[in-house]
Amino acid sequence: MQIFVKTLTGKTITLEVEPSDTIENVKAKIQDKEGIPPDQQRLIFAGKQLEDGRTLSDYNIQKESTLHLVLRLRGGAKKRKKKSYTTPKKNKHKRKKVKLAVLKYYKVDENGKIHRLRRECPADECGAGVFMASHFDRHYCGKCCLTYCFNKPEDK
């Protein structure tokens, strides 16, 4: 019977084979026609790679079937060494969770009146509820970097 073998270049070659022929025999016939060594050949039929020890009838290859020939690639990517670091990995900063933190920002006097202890940032991008840090000489917003400095009275 006659089968077709399509190579990578798109060229189709015809082979005269028997259903009892092994895949090794087919590869040897391809070597005679194309000069490609059998150990570099991979034959594909119906999406499956054909194994050397089996016959054409095992794969249900009939007359005028087309096999696809691809070349076997040896090896793979170069192995890379695992990096070893001399210094330990730096820990990511974790914010401290303070329970009832809002109590730091307000104070209730004996009359029940609420006073703000910290200044709220007036910038539009910060919005309500963003307080400025109180330093000895300034108020500073950590979100928008707005700073208000205090005037120091000059000593004479």
Swiss-Prot record:
GO terms for cellular component: cytoplasm; nucleolus; ribosome; small-subunit processome. One of its GO terms (biological process) is ribosomal small subunit biogenesis. The record marks 68 as: Essential for function. Keywords: Cytoplasm, Isopeptide bond, Metal-binding, Nucleus, Ribonucleoprotein, Ribosomal protein, Ubl conjugation, Zinc, Zinc-finger. GO terms for molecular function: structural constituent of ribosome; zinc ion binding. It comes from the Eukaryota. Residues 1-76 form the Ubiquitin-like domain. Residues 75-95 are annotated as: Disordered. A zinc finger (C4-type) spans 121-144. There is a cross-link at residue 76 (Glycyl lysine isopeptide (Gly-Lys) (interchain with K-? in acceptor proteins)). InterPro entries: Ribosomal_eS31, Ribosomal_eS31_euk-type_sf, Ribosomal_zn-bd, Ubiquitin-like_dom, Ubiquitin-like_domsf, Ubiquitin_CS, Ubiquitin_dom, Ubiquitin_ubiquitin-like. The record marks 54, 72 as: Interacts with activating enzyme. Coiled coil: none annotated. In the N-terminal section; belongs to the ubiquitin family. In the C-terminal section; belongs to the eukaryotic ribosomal protein eS31 family. Ubiquitin is synthesized as a polyubiquitin precursor with exact head to tail repeats, the number of repeats differ between species. In some species there is a final amino-acid after the last repeat. Some ubiquitin genes contain a single copy of ubiquitin fused to a ribosomal protein (either eL40 or eS31). This is Ubiquitin-ribosomal protein eS31 fusion protein. It comes from Ictalurus punctatus.
